[in-house]
UniProtKB/Swiss-Prot annotation:
InterPro entries: MPN (IPR037518), RadC_JAB (IPR025657), RuvA_2-like (IPR010994), UPF0758 (IPR001405), UPF0758_CS (IPR020891), UPF0758_N (IPR046778)
Sequence motif: JAMM motif, positions: 174-187
GO biological process, one term: proteolysis
Protein name: UPF0758 protein Bpet3149
Organism: Bordetella petrii (strain ATCC BAA-461 / DSM 12804 / CCUG 43448)
The organism's place on the tree of life at top rank: Bacteria
Family statement: Belongs to the UPF0758 family.
SUPFAM superfamilies, A to Z: JAB1/MPN domain, RuvA domain 2-like
Binding-site positions, Zn(2+): H174, H176, D187
Amino acid sequence: MPLPADLPPHERPRERLLRHGPASLRDAELLALALRTGTRGRTAIDMGSQLLHRYGGLRGLFAASPQELMSLPGLGAAKAGTLAAILELARRAAEERLMRQQAMSEPGSVKRYFKTALANCAVEHCLALYLDSQLNLITSGELARGTLARASVYPREVVREALRHHAAALILAHNHPSGSAQPSQADRDFTRHMQQALALVEIRLLDHLIVAGDTVVSMAELGLL
């Protein structure tokens, strides 16, 4: 692939972005602009393409930590830090959209948020959305990060965090790296215990979502809450 500087001006990613907008660029080209330069034998666009291939797309890239990015050939602290910052801004933008609306008035937005955050994580993560009495988002947070098989979350810790944020309701979500989004018996038991613990302090558990790849299962929609 020719270097971006060797392309005719109208074909270079930056010039195309400025002329036609960012939507006119492929994902690899947008990543190339963030990376700025390639390495010996690889253009920045090549590196962007390889990142997408390695992580199975943008959602997988979202789940990569800065340390993991730095372990890849040609990605030093500067490039990894820039990518991590851009990905975090995208995550916060998704969170900001939720904060502008009642969280439960657009359940599709909640599912998209958790799918973006969890779909391609290699280990289990458990996340929470903390809501006020009008079901507006107060903040979000990670409750646990575990092994391939499980993330340990204790009801008392969730209750403590909910009280700290003055939440009136919670939405929980975790991922199944195994690939099946169907709730296990352990998921059902955990949800029941969490609902009971939160009820003691008059906080509602509105839903518990399970993410596996492109699938998001709502335990509330299944009648398990």
